[in-house]
Regions:
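Positively charged, low-complexity/disordered segments
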Residues: 1-14
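Active-site nucleotide/adenylate-binding loops and adjacent lid/helix of ATP-dependent enzymes
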Residues: 16-91, 97, 108-110, 133, ...
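Peripheral (often C-terminal) accessory segments that flank ATP-dependent C-N-forming ligase machineries
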Residues: 42-44, 207-320
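Protein kinase-like catalytic core scaffold
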Residues: 52, 113, 177-180
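Short, flexible turn/loop "capping" segments at secondary-structure junctions
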Residues: 56-59, 128, 269-274
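Short, well-ordered beta-strand elements within core beta-sheets of diverse protein domains
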Residues: 66, 94, 195, 276-284
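ATP-dependent carboxylate/phosphate-activation module, predominantly the ATP-grasp catalytic core
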Residues: 72, 94-160, 164, 171, ...
């Protein structure tokens, strides 16, 4: 990754988890025990307890990220993560039970402003980390205050001035542990989710920032309940997306996103890079949200060349 000057300490290789973890520990920002490995080394993991999480140190999307329960599984996952990593190293850390929270901030003149936080709902009982939904609301007011405190710790430690800031954390028993952070907005369709939840057009503000202007943020809570549902498919070649525009035109969905295009081949449904599409739903109550999602799922289809629906339906029933 490139060095980026953010008005103070130079942040090198923002996607480099080794560098990031080192600084989290140095500045006493809560995070899990970890080790950086370029090959299997049991002595480095003496005090670790299974299950463990293995990640490439420097890699896009969630490729190579695995949860392992045994030494044999660790060997396989480590070899894969090292291959995926640009640095040929992997990070191994203890798996933290709890809710995964994705929190977006905008740093304005060295002060972190809270935009929104969502719960990254994953598929149950799997070794991979397949995110099925980003759910809102995810936290209460007290937890929002704690998130702001952690974000400001990161801002102060790195002397950040004007930049988006994404922090991913685990929440358990009202305690946060930082998984990772980066000076960027969330990828894919996250920009739209931020806008719908907070009223902030983060994409436009980021462009203004790059052009030398100083965007001013005034986030507010726009909706009561929302969910971004991610769509995965069974293996096959996509021929057409059915039902999306009709649901948008009839206001069942707020927005939809096609991450794949017609003619592309789907081989698996594991990482964020495997998603075929996504759609955003808002509601006034949790029950209304669930009813909308159930109806939408029944109306959508992704057809292959033979007219067979290869969309994985009912995924919202499989979340943790």
């Amino acid at each position: 990754g490139k060095s980026v000057d953010l008005g103070g300490r130079r942040i090198i290789k923002k996607k480099n988890k080794s560098y990031m973890k080192k600084f989290l520990k140095e500045f006493n920002i809560p995070t899990s025990q970890y080790a950086i490995l370029d090959s299997f080394d049991n002595t480095a993991l003496n005090n670790f307890h299974y299950p463990l999480v293995v990640k490439p140190v420097d890699c896009n999307s969630s490729k190579g990220v695995k949860k392992v329960f045994t030494e044999m599984e660790l060997h396989v996952a480590l070899e894969s993560a090292i291959l995926y990593s640009r640095t040929n190293t992997a990070i191994v850390e203890e798996f933290k039970e709890g809710e995964e929270i994705s929190a977006d901030f905008y740093v304005e003149k060295g002060i972190a402003k809270f935009l929104c936080a969502t719960n990254s709902a994953k598929m149950r009982n799997t070794h991979s980390f397949t995110i099925l939904q980003s759910r809102y609301p995810a936290i209460g007011d007290e937890q929002k205050g704690e998130l702001l405190r952690i974000a400001q710790q990161i801002v102060d430690a790195f002397h950040l001035e004007n930049t988006p800031l994404l922090v991913q954390l685990i929440l358990k028993d009202n305690h946060f542990d930082v998984l990772e952070f980066s000076t960027r907005m969330g990828g894919g369709s996250k920009y739209k989710l931020i806008e719908v939840l907070s009223g902030v057009n983060i994409m436009s503000s980021y462009v203004d920032l790059i052009l030398g202007e100083s965007p001013r943020m005034a986030p507010w809570e726009k909706v009561k309940y929302a969910v971004m549902n991610y769509i995965y498919c069974y293996p096959g070649i996509i021929n057409s997306f059915e039902g999306f525009k009709n649901l948008l035109d009839n206001s069942f969905i707020e927005e939809y996103f096609l991450y794949k295009t017609e003619g592309m081949e789907i081989t698996k449904a594991e990482t964020s890079g495997d998603r075929a599409a996504g759609y955003l739903v808002v509601a006034s109550t949790e029950q209304e949200l669930q009813e909308k999602v159930s109806y939408i799922d029944s109306q959508l289809a992704i057809l292959n060349n033979n007219g067979v629906d290869i969309m994985c339906h009912g995924l919202s029933d499989l979340v943790l």
